[in-house]
Structure formats: structure tokens, C-alpha cells
């Protein structure tokens, strides 16, 4: 009976024998191909014996395969694990280097470690085509990349751009603390600008210059998670990623707003420390400027109390406002409002005195006009003195003539002389000359 079954299924007998040998050798930790010569001969004898006993079967009959057939194969060895991350989380070389990826200075040699909070977002395959943008290596943070539209460059120019980008683009450092995130995001933004992605960075109004593509969003997400591990992100960044783990643009927009706020705080502190006021501007404008600065600093967590604010304000006062330093420095509980009351009082007094000065000047001008008209009226008087001088000269000549005629008549002349000696002599002495007695 057994010989008849063996004759009908000769391959099953051979396979079972080999399977038993293989299983026995695997359990003894021996190479399945390393079989002794005696065992090989026994196996061959059993197969020839079975072949000699089998009956002739029709050629058209098909022998069914045994699904439990085990061929002698070496045991499979699992591939070694590379690093602490499992192989299913590691990106392949083709996925890390899609077409055009190196144009952006992508660090393809670094494995992508996914966030624990979100599934892995793999970059697109090599079938996607990248738009090429002009190189803007080394641009400052405030300078956006020029928008190039949807134009494509030829392969030769793209290759030259790729080599130049690889040469100059430097990746950002690794984030190691949540407190270092404001400084780190500045270097990351500069890395994007140097990688010709300045157009996708949000501007002051929170909107980018151009629309970001899917490939650029993938690059943005992958580079962000490489250089900013999730355990070192601030709380507000984790809150954004918990809603949408790919919304890196919102993180950049919020970071830029915080940068501007920090810059405004620094400018307000410098302005408050260098206040100067001498009454050249209205007191209302000066008060509004100072109070707005103090309110902004208080809202941003930098509290300025009344004592410090008054000291900073009084230190910048000059001119007539300077004495407020000495009249108010003894009041410890003085407020900013009380100090500005004194400043307003001095300013109003200055304005009142300045308004009265134009009337005084106008009176002086009137007096000058009157003096000018008076000098004009004196000019005819000067001219009227000439006939008076001529009359005086005529009288002098007439007197001289009388004296000469009196010499001819001695009697009358003596009387005239005696009369003239008794009469006072009036001299037109312009230089205030005085004659000594006895000289005439």
C-alpha cells in the first residue's frame, strides 16, 4: 500500500525527505547546504528505489503541488537598525533628494526625524517640477526676494544656480532651548532668504510677497522640524502645531510680529531715557508722546512707575522748565499727571508773554516812524537859517561902515564910542569861549 502511494507521488516523498533534513539542520544551527556525503547518498538511493517501483502514468496527468513544500534556503537575517529611529520613519535617498531640492540648499544627508505629535509628511517624488527663482544670497532680513512669477529657467542656468546655492547657503543652528527660539528663528528666516525663498516670508502686514507652493511648503516643514526639535519649542509654537502641524507660515508670521514688538520696546525705552523738552513744542503734544510710550511699555510687561517716569521726564527738562527739578524733587508721591500740570502752567505763561511781544515791537516801530517824520520837518529849518546868517552879516557890515564914518567926524564919533563902551557887547560864541578881563 505504501509502495503504491510512493509510486503515485514520487515528488512528495523526495520533498518530505529533504524537508526533514533541512529542518533538522536548521535547528542544529548548521548550514543547510553543508550536507555530509553519506546522507546525500542515502537520499539518492531512496529516490532511485521509488522511481524503480513507480508505475507508468499518463503524460497528461498533472501532479498537484504541495503547499507545505519547503525548499532548502538560508535563514533570513533582519537588516540592522540605523540609529534610534525605526526604519519606517527614515526617508529614503530618493525621497530626500527630489528633483530641484538641492537648489534650495536642502541638507539631504540629514535624516528627517518626525514630530511625535504628527505623522510624517514626505516630500513629493521626482515627477514634480520646480520653478526656478533668481539667486539672492546674503540678503538682509528686511529685504524680500524679488517675485519671479511662474517662469522657468533652462537646465544650464538651473545647474549653475544650484552649484552657487550649495556653495553659499549655510543651514541654521540646532535649537537647544525654548528661550533661544527668538534668536534661532532669525537665523532660520535668513536661511530661507539665502535659499531664494524670501518671497514666501510674511512681511510687516503679515502677508507674503507671493503664494507658497506645495513643494516649498514641504521643504519648509522638513527643515523646520530638523533644526527645531519639538521638545525645545516654546508653548505658543506647540499650540499652533497642535492645530495644524504643517502651518509653519503662521509660526513665522507670529515670530516677525514679536520681533517688531521687541524692537518697538527697545525704541520706547531709548526714547524715554533721552527725553528733551524746552517749550519749543506744545505741552499737549509732549504729554501725549510720553504717556503713549509709558502705556505701551506697561502693556508689554515693562512696568514704569510714577517715580521712575517723573525722574526721566525732569531729567530732560531745560530752559524755564529746569527749575521743576528742584521744586518737585522733594515730593516722593508725585505723579506724572501732577508734573505735567506744572509743565502746562509754564508753557501757558510763555505763550502769554510771547503774544504781548508783538504789540511792544509795533510801538517801537511807530516811534521810529515818528522820529523819521520829525527829522523831515527840521530840514526846512536848516534852510531858513541862511537868510538869518545873511542878515547878521549885513548888520556887521553896516556897523563897520558906521564905525568908519564915525572916524571922519570926531565929535560924533566920541559920543558913539562912549556910548558903545557902556553898552554890552553880544558875541555869537558857538564854541563857548570866554575872554579874560583886561584883554580888551
Curated annotation (Swiss-Prot):
It is found in: Cytoplasm. GO terms for biological process: viral translational frameshifting. The record marks 401-402 as: Cleavage. InterPro entries: TYA. Coiled coil: none annotated. Residues 429-440 have a biased composition (Basic and acidic residues). Residues 1-93, 126-173, 352-440 are annotated as: Disordered. It comes from the Eukaryota. GO terms for molecular function: RNA binding. Residues 299-401 are annotated as: RNA-binding. Its main location: cytoplasm. Induction: Ty1-LR4 is a highly expressed element. Induced under amino acid starvation conditions by GCN4. Residues 153-165, 402-418 have a biased composition (Low complexity). Pfam families: TYA. Residues 1-10, 48-60, 127-152, 419-428 have a biased composition (Polar residues). Keywords: Cytoplasm, Phosphoprotein, RNA-binding, Transposable element. GO terms for cellular component: cytoplasm. The modification Phosphoserine is found at residue 416. Retrotransposons are mobile genetic entities that are able to replicate via an RNA intermediate and a reverse transcription step. In contrast to retroviruses, retrotransposons are non-infectious, lack an envelope and remain intracellular. Ty1 retrotransposons belong to the copia elements (pseudoviridae). Capsid protein (CA) is the structural component of the virus-like particle (VLP), forming the shell that encapsulates the retrotransposons dimeric RNA genome. The particles are assembled from trimer-clustered units and there are holes in the capsid shells that allow for the diffusion of macromolecules. CA also has nucleocapsid-like chaperone activity, promoting primer tRNA(i)-Met annealing to the multipartite primer-binding site (PBS), dimerization of Ty1 RNA and initiation of reverse transcription. Homotrimer. The C-terminal RNA-binding region of CA is sufficient for all its nucleocapsid-like chaperone activities. This is Transposon Ty1-LR4 Gag polyprotein. It comes from Saccharomyces cerevisiae (strain ATCC 204508 / S288c). The lineage of its organism: Eukaryota, Fungi, Dikarya, Ascomycota, Saccharomycotina. The gene is TY1A-LR4.
